[in-house]
């Protein structure tokens, strides 16, 4: 009997919900770190590509919306599931 998680177990552990060019997990980080790391992460993809970010800081929905508005990116998804905030951002 194997102690390794099956692929379906691993998928259950991964809360990413979207098929994006980049996925980054900022859970455990407090403001302003999720937005600062999102900015840096977006530098890794091209204009028009999408990135999915996870965060659990209660301030992150407001922070991510403000970040996208001021930087010109499009916030496609801002959702919360089980205390995890899920964001999909389209890079300008």
Regions found by a protein language model. Name each.
Residues 2-3, 21, 55, 63:
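A broadly tuned "polar low-complexity/structure-edge" signature
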Residues 3-43:
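N-terminal first-folded block
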Residues 26-79:
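Amphipathic, hydrophobic secondary-structure cores in small proteins
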Residues 86-92:
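Core SAM-dependent methyltransferase catalytic element
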Residues 21, 48-52, 84-86:
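Intrinsic-disorder/low-complexity, polar/charged segments enriched in Ser/Thr/Lys/Arg/Asp/Glu/Gln
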Residues 1, 5-7, 59, 77:
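Intrinsically disordered, low-complexity segments enriched in Ser/Pro/Gly/Ala and basic residues
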